[in-house]
From Swiss-Prot:
Gene3D superfamilies: Ribosomal protein L22/L17. The lineage of its organism: Eukaryota, Metazoa, Ecdysozoa, Arthropoda, Hexapoda. It comes from the Eukaryota. Keywords: Ribonucleoprotein, Ribosomal protein. Residues 158-168, 178-187 have a biased composition (Basic and acidic residues). GO terms for molecular function: structural constituent of ribosome. Transmembrane segments: none annotated. Residues 158-187 are annotated as: Disordered. This is Large ribosomal subunit protein uL22. One of its GO terms (biological process) is cytoplasmic translation. HAMAP family: Ribosomal_uL22_A (MF_01331_A). InterPro entries: Ribosomal_uL22, Ribosomal_uL22_CS, Ribosomal_uL22_euk/arc, Ribosomal_uL22_sf. GO terms for cellular component: cytosolic large ribosomal subunit.
Length: 187
């Protein structure tokens, strides 16, 4: 088992999943992974299923040369987007694996959030294509490694407010002096 690029802060409240040398385009997968980062698990699964059905698009921010525009990208504040079906299917499979790991650990699956997802390039696979005049050109593929970790979302606890603290507002020297004088008169 390899080392993860980022270990979770609280290992008992987290679960991980990874895939190596996956035969899916690196560039498309990188953009799809960035779209689901920091999403709750259920929302990310729904988003990826919508991408497969072309109901929601993945915004292409870095690798967007020659990528057409689509109206669904307005939701992300950009105009360039696509529906990388194979990338979405691979990520959905990894999320399913991470969910099974969380279930095994006894975590609450409905409170899981994707706090780390990373896509790295894997070694290229070489094939050949035959060209005119007896030439041969390379026909390369760009596989990738994917790793992700899910963490149970912490409940945000609001600080209890004291009435005495609210009453103690910061007063200017002038107002403090007036209060002292008023107290002296009353005595």
């Amino acid at each position: 088992m390899g080392r993860y690029a980022k270990e979770p802060d609280n290992a008992s409240k987290s679960c991980k999943s990874r895939g190596s040398n996956l035969r899916v385009h690196f560039k498309n997968t990188r953009e799809t992974a960035l779209a689901i980062k920091r999403m709750p698990l259920r929302r990310a699964q729904r988003f990826l299923k919508n991408v497969i059905e072309k109901k929601e698009c993945v915004p292409f921010r870095r690798f967007n040369g020659g990528v057409g525009r689509c109206a669904q990208a307005k939701h992300w504040g950009t105009s360039v987007g696509r529906w990388p079906k194979k990338s979405a299917e691979f990520l959905l499979q990894l999320l399913k694996n991470a969910e099974a790991n969380a279930d095994y650990k006894g975590l609450d699956v409905d409170r899981l959030v994707i706090n780390h997802i990373q896509v790295n390039r894997a070694p290229c696979l070489r094939r050949r294509t035959y060209r005119a005049h007896g030439r041969i050109n390379p026909y390369m593929s760009s596989p990738c490694h994917i790793e992700l970790s899910l963490t149970e979302k912490e409940d945000v606890v609001t600080k209890a407010t004291d009435e005495s603290e609210q009453a103690k507002k910061k007063l200017s020297k002038k107002k403090l002096q007036r209060q002292k004088e008023k107290m002296m008169r009353n005595e």
